[in-house]
Design a protein with these regions (language model features):
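ATP-binding N-terminal substructure of ATP-dependent carboxylate-amine bond-forming enzymes
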Residues: 1-106
Length: 107
């Protein structure tokens, strides 16, 4: 099964639909965010296979450890996205550090 890590899946609030469709298409949808799990939209909770709460998405080390945990538990990460312009550089760094080749432009 393919693994999709979604950074900050709770923002904007309608992104749970993206997670739902990924899950409906057979992917493990693994969320990383700084919002407590109990405060997530119920639709988002149902759309995620697992959620890892970090203290701050600004802390690269915390987010890195979250991706490492998912890699250990679920195997290779196939996609990593936030779909949020603010996190694009962070997404790219994580893709590089975890050798994630799918979901990025090849030059």
């Amino acid at each position: 099964m393919k693994n999709f890590v979604f950074i900050s899946p709770n923002f904007p609030t309608n992104y749970w639909q993206f997670c739902r469709e990924l899950k409906n298409n057979g992917l493990n949808v693994l969320g990383i965010g700084d919002q407590p799990y109990d405060e997530l939209n119920p639709n988002l909770k149902d759309s995620l296979n697992e959620y890892y709460k970090v203290g701050s998405l600004e802390n690269y080390d915390e987010v890195y450890r979250a991706v490492a945990f998912f890699t250990f538990k679920y195997g290779r990460i196939d996609w990593l996205e936030s779909n949020n312009e603010y996190w694009l550089e962070r997404d790219a760094m994580l893709r590089t550090d975890f050798h994630i080749k799918i979901g990025r432009a090849h030059v």
